[in-house]
């Protein structure tokens, strides 16, 4: 194996129906951010569970996949993390879910954190990581007292949906504040769920005006950064988005270099 080559980033797929056939898919904008923003190869991980011989029902399968990776990217999605993943009941039966992705993503996150594998999460991925590590979520931010409506308007053009929506305050001494070179930044907002209780060993990196956590980093182990917004959307036009993917790439290349050194030593 050539360890000076591009790092390999795993991207967990959604399980959707298009129109009636089950399809494992990842949005093009996420793969573009991995290949062009991170400077890596994208490895799509299917959400395969609950069928005979399926991958990822055996914890060893998770490990074998992670053995091939230099980083893990958890993307956004139209579905929500099912509240059973953090010990709660479903408050709205109409809430879209993807329990196959829940199972694969959360299992991947837990094992990746144990290894110190670099992790980046956005939107749903931000919520998945928090749930995987012991945190909880607001199932409907817009119906939570004291919090604003953070959802997009479906009938708006995409450039409006993904356009700047509100400012976030960046934590003093935090990674994002250093990358942004400022105490605040404007972000888009396209989410119905949000962080309620932050998981242990995660530190707040950004907060919305209503107090909702919008970004966090891992305090122990390897590189872990997650944001509630969508930095992958036209990332080339946003200096902070560029830096988020660059620094994830730096962590992935460092991981790959260590893998190479370990392989040569053995």
Question: Model regions: which residues?
Answer:
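Conserved G/P- and acidic residue-centered "switch" motifs that form tight phosphate/ATP-binding loops
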Residues: 123
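Active-site-proximal beta-strand elements of phosphoester/diester hydrolases
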Residues: 225-228
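N-terminal beta1-alpha1 cap of cysteine-dependent amidohydrolase-like domains
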Residues: 1-120, 131-138, 142-180, 184-186, ...
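The feature captures the ABC ATPase H-loop/switch
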Residues: 126
């Amino acid at each position: 194996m050539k360890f000076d080559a591009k790092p390999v980033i795993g991207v967990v797929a959604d399980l959707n129906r298009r129109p009636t056939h089950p399809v494992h898919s990842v949005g093009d904008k996420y793969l573009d951010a991995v290949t062009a923003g991170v400077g890596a190869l994208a490895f799509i991980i299917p959400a395969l569970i609950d069928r005979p011989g399926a991958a990822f029902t055996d914890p060893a399968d998770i490990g074998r996949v992670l053995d091939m990776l230099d980083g893990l990217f958890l993307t956004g999605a139209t579905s929500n993390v099912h509240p059973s993943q953090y010990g709660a009941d479903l408050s709205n039966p109409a809430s879209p879910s993807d329990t196959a992705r829940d199972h694969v993503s959360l299992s991947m996150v837990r094992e990746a954190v144990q290894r110190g594998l670099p992790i980046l999460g956005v939107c749903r991925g931000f919520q998945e990581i928090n749930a995987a590590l012991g945190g909880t979520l607001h199932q409907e931010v817009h119906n939570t007292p004291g919090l604003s409506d953070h959802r997009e308007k479906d009938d708006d053009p995409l450039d409006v949906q993904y356009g700047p929506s509100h400012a976030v305050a960046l934590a003093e001494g935090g990674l994002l504040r250093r990358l942004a070179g400022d105490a605040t930044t404007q972000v888009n907002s396209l989410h119905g769920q949000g962080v309620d209780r932050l998981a242990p060993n995660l530190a707040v990196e950004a907060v919305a005006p209503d107090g909702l956590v919008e970004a966090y980093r891992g305090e122990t182990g390897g590189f872990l950064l997650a944001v509630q917004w969508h930095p992958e959307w036209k990332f080339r036009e946003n200096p902070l988005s560029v830096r988020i993917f660059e620094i994830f790439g730096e962590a992935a290349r460092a991981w790959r270099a260590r893998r190479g050194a370990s392989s040569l030593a053995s």
